[in-house]
Amino acid sequence: MEWKMVKQMVKCAALTLAAVFMLSAVSAQAAGFKKEYKMQVTVGPKFYWGMGATKFAELVKEKTNGQINIKPYFGSALLKGAQLKSSQMVAKGVIDCAMDSTINISPVIPQANVFHLPFFLNDFENLDKVKNGEAGQAIFDAMKAKRLQPLAWAENGFRQLTNSKISVKTPADMKGLRVRVVGNPMFIDTFKALGADPVNMNWGDAVAGFQQGVVDGQENPVGVLIPVQIFQYHKYTTMWNYLVDPLIFYWNQKQWKKFPKEIQDAILEAAQEAGRFETALCRAGLDGDTSINILKNEFNYDMAVPNPVKFMEEKGMTVNFLSDDERKAFIDATQSVYDKWVGKIGKDVVEKAKADMAR
């Protein structure tokens, strides 16, 4: 008899849960919400960036009681790999939302290139001041003017140099080095100013180039270097923080304005929480114990690679950090790039960033 009662209770609970989900779905449809909101994500789900997108989708579903369901499309699947078109497609409403890089939005939002000025930002403290200061707000305002609704910051990280030829410590070491870079013109200008030979190519072609010895190096954040196992191709890493690659959660503005305030608030809260999680993933082991503790205490998450520098060294890589004097030499060598791009970014935004860092 007792077992029969237990079975009835389990059945009743299952029916109740099903009813809750059905009611959520019905209420979502009645409110005019889509069954699925498509989210553009450049990388795959196993990268920190991809993990942040997954966390965002999970949190939005939880905080809206299942009314808003986001499906991340990884590897720029919605764009057939054309990641630089992401902000345009979101603005048009072809794609609902994105977790995107400042690199990708910079053709539409040139103010975002303030993060890509060579050797302009050098640490997490200054990065946070700029993101959360007047310069960061100027970028968000520029996005709103382009029919994009910014939600929260996240991070891909400071981009570091790896190569198979030499431990880079001076601009002279860069001479003739054939380096794979992303298709942002400022990146190409920077490497040319350093005497390198920058090559814009997709990652698959770059790996083939590494294996064949026709491409010497590349630049990416540590959070990318570890999962792509860069140690298989390169011996040397230079931790030079030459520029940084923040991420932004954003939504189609027209669609966003139609959401009730309680839904907007829930999505904003989810974006901020997911951004904090993903940023901690990218900084773990690079900012002392700060991000490690955030992940453990706030998200109950333990890093598989808690010390990325040690990990690369254990894999046989030589990891070099620039001294202040060495960094100064790189700043001087790329001054022409800075001068060329300040006007294109907007001198007012650059000055705001300087003021943010001075606070």
Where would I find each of the regions flagged by the language model?
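N-terminal secretory/targeting leader peptides
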Residues: A31-N126, A135, K144-R359
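Active-site-adjacent segment of FAD-dependent monooxygenases/related oxidoreductases
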Residues: K131
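Short, low-complexity disordered leader/linker segments with a strong preference
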Residues: M1-E36, A358-R359
